[in-house]
Amino acid sequence: MAITVQETAKIVADFQQAPNDTGSPEVQVALLSARITYLTEHFKSHAKDHHSRRGLLKLVSQRRKLLDYLKRKNADRYRTLIERLGLRK
């Protein structure tokens, strides 16, 4: 996988809501965004890697579902998260 353990730990520490929080929507979306960013860079040099492109589409879909969930449950946390990650909307 592209994201190292140290990068994962840093992302979790930046977005966790409480100590030992690794499952909140914010953490999950941040980790997915990091993987999506890596794969996007990968496709700049490997344009014909269709197998990985399918994985990218699954990651984007999963992130969208988590963002929709967060928007439904707590709109303020949703807005804060998309600002921190620099996502559209």
From Swiss-Prot:
Gene3D superfamilies: 6.10.250.3130, S15/NS1, RNA-binding
Any one of the GO BP annotations: translation
Pfam families: Ribosomal_S15
Keyword RNA-binding: yes
Transmembrane segments: none
UniProt keyword annotations, A-Z: Ribonucleoprotein, Ribosomal protein, RNA-binding, rRNA-binding
CDD domains associated with the record: Ribosomal_S15p_S13e
One GO cellular component term: cytosolic small ribosomal subunit
GO MF term set: rRNA binding; structural constituent of ribosome
PANTHER family: RIBOSOMAL PROTEIN S15, BACTERIAL AND ORGANELLAR, SMALL RIBOSOMAL SUBUNIT PROTEIN US15M
Function of the protein: One of the primary rRNA binding proteins, it binds directly to 16S rRNA where it helps nucleate assembly of the platform of the 30S subunit by binding and bridging several RNA helices of the 16S rRNA. Forms an intersubunit bridge (bridge B4) with the 23S rRNA of the 50S subunit in the ribosome.
Family: Belongs to the universal ribosomal protein uS15 family.
Assembly behavior: Part of the 30S ribosomal subunit. Forms a bridge to the 50S subunit in the 70S ribosome, contacting the 23S rRNA.
This protein's name: Small ribosomal subunit protein uS15
Organism: Methylobacillus flagellatus (strain ATCC 51484 / DSM 6875 / VKM B-1610 / KT)
Gene responsible for this protein: rpsO
